[in-house]
Amino acid sequence: MLHIFLSYFYIIFFLIVFPTQLLLLYVIIFHSPKHLKTLKRIFLCNCSCQIFSMITLVLLQARQVSNLNPVELWCYGPLRYLDAIVAYTMYVLCEGTVLMSSILIFITMYVKYEAVRSIHRERSAKFSVIILSLSPLFITMSAEAYLTIEYHLPIEYQEKFSAINSNLGDHTVIGYIALDNIPAQIVFCTICGFFVIFPLIMFCLRRNIILFINSKLDLSSTTMRQQNRALINGLTLQAFLPLFCVCPIFICSFVALITKTEILLEQYFVSVVLLLPTFFEPYITFYTVSHYRKQVRIWLGKENMGSMMLVVSVSRL
């Protein structure tokens, strides 16, 4: 059975990724130079969101049964022993943190774009960009809050879930996904629209950054070229990651939801593909941020503090 295999996968995945996330969190807090003040805050928020979403997904081990009407959410993880409202609330919060993490990746790329092009905007303009970027999160969470209060929090719904789950063994039903009301349609359209538009914007920013870097290539030092190469490679990975991890499973979910076709890989692996960025993102951050990369190499005995000071000096230019 897939859920038995995945129960071991989730544990192994957690044991591998959680220490890496903690290491990244430590490096961000204690080894971020002062000139990375803005990026430090973004990295901290993103790392915290990814840690929370990873722990929640491992505890949930959710399955989205898309061929049923309405779509049922099944929980195979330890949270199945708690009330359905608790597991569903954690599912909604996880949905929000995954969306938040994706938005923060975009904001990170936008900040790098402004840094590369030496664009200095007023604080109000930066605030407007951040609010606009976070608007999908605000819309989704507002609609999800309404759905939770209206369709999951009332006593009669909790009693209904308790009656259903009393006869189940290896899983519990924690909630439903139905598109028969406006808030649910808003959530569906916002999330699907975001994960379609998000990679396109990322590729546009990546292209503009590469064009600008290439135009200044003759004036760059060897060290700066190496840092630019790492930056471009990191931007490429961040742009392609949602395209290959999230978009295919969302397309399968959309097809299954419309046609009511039973696609087991889609049902079980929705949570798995949402976990994948938590594996890749720490390594991308270590690789693209030269100060973090050098710090790790110092710990491994492959660099000395002199090279670290050189990186700090060059990165300020």
From Swiss-Prot:
Membrane topology type, per the record?
Multi-pass membrane protein
Q: Where are the bilayer-spanning segments?
A: 9-29, 42-62, 91-111, 129-149, 185-205, 239-259, 269-289
Q: Where in the cell is it found?
A: Membrane
Q: Which Gene3D superfamilies does the record associate with it?
A: Rhodopsin 7-helix transmembrane proteins
Q: Which UniProt keywords apply?
A: Membrane, Transmembrane, Transmembrane helix
Q: Which Pfam families match?
A: 7TM_GPCR_Srd (PF10317)
Cite a GO CC annotation. Answer: membrane
Principal cellular location given in the protein's record: membrane
Domain of life where this protein originates: Eukaryota
| Statement: the UniProt record of this protein carries the keyword Membrane | yes
What does the similarity note say?
Answer: Belongs to the nematode receptor-like protein srd family.
Q: What's the name of the protein?
A: Serpentine receptor class delta-46
Q: Please report the organism this UniProt entry assigns to the protein.
A: Caenorhabditis elegans
